[in-house]
């Protein structure tokens, strides 16, 4: 498999540190608010990576962390009066529920910073003992970037007046680029944890480094195969992670670094300051998880994604075609996936997750199958193979797994659903009474509402026309 390594800035052949296995760590959310589309895109990108590696026969071990100690969380505590655990537990569950709606497979390991404090403190102490970190008078602990000759190798963009120096103010820092490993308590009201250096809390960067060392064994040269996250994390977060781990362990953190592009809303970078931050929960309510998954994955993961209604509707129409084909070949059981079709999809996804080619392969399969069914509508072998093809799409890409009528009900609000069910019940009763005039009138009323119905052995099903 070919993947794009952000450090080498080129596509490389994936060669795992342990034969047949793939270890992946993805930076998860800071859990103080609802997830936005940027969180969704990152999760979907690395879900595709995990699914592809599994389809290629690798045993994948993926970790995605939750940052549940952070200044933003503490601010939320102050604003709401709720405990830190109440806030973080609530938003972690919200995030997991929304990822499930998107079809994102759960990570094998979901570490929290609060559950990794021993590992964090141990790594900080190791860095102090090795003279890569220093404690200042107020109890803060800083990483000394001047001691790491490879600092800057990950992002290739380090300078003395970087973002770090503007964010972390302390006159006792030895270098502007030095960053906090541990932040001492600021007062009695602060949320703090005991440690040998001072009572305080960990810095953001050290949390990920320590959790990786806690849960992954590595091979003595690298701790994990792939470290992933959004492009905005490349510097300073991933640069700092790499430096800490390198100096604490004596080997590199990750063999490969992968990053997904930004999300824009109608051509502007999504951000809370611009007031165009789109919460994932709102998008899920309007479009449903599967349509959103298809759309957010329809652009290559490394490219910036411009979220707009027109492109979303175009993506939905492509997904609709798959479900219309599925409706055409059901009911029935799958046979064996078409070998050429399966290989074409695997070839596309093995080329650094080339989703555009993969979707084109699917579109071609849909068109060719429909053409064959037009000629031979009762071709059972073709129908069984098509069911298998769609099941493989669902396994590899995470869409196509719903029942067609369930899929085509997405976007219908609950009030309208309730009205439809009432009308269908009235129609059933009319048919039992052989009142076909009323039955036909109800069908026509539903058609006028934009709803089509089909009578099956299991009962009447409906969908948006």
Swiss-Prot record:
It is found in: Cytoplasm. Gene3D superfamilies: Cysteine-tRNA ligase, C-terminal anti-codon recognition domain (1.20.120.1910), HUPs (3.40.50.620). Zn(2+) binds at residues 27, 208, 237, 241. GO terms for molecular function: ATP binding; cysteine-tRNA ligase activity; zinc ion binding. The keyword Amino-acid biosynthesis does not apply. A motif ('KMSKS' region) lies at residues 269-273. Residues 153-173 are annotated as: Disordered. Coiled coil: none annotated. Binds 1 zinc ion per subunit. Keywords: Aminoacyl-tRNA synthetase, ATP-binding, Cytoplasm, Ligase, Metal-binding, Nucleotide-binding, Protein biosynthesis, Zinc. Its EC number is 6.1.1.16. It comes from the Bacteria. A motif ('HIGH' region) lies at residues 29-39. Pfam families: CysS_C (PF23493), tRNA-synt_1e (PF01406). GO terms for cellular component: cytosol. It catalyses: tRNA(Cys) + L-cysteine + ATP = L-cysteinyl-tRNA(Cys) + AMP + diphosphate. The keyword Aminoacyl-tRNA synthetase applies. It is an enzyme of class 6 (ligase). ATP binds at residue 272. Its cofactor is Zn(2+). One of its GO terms (biological process) is cysteinyl-tRNA aminoacylation. Monomer. Belongs to the class-I aminoacyl-tRNA synthetase family. This is Cysteine--tRNA ligase. The lineage of its organism: Bacteria, Pseudomonadati, Campylobacterota, Epsilonproteobacteria, Campylobacterales. The gene is cysS.
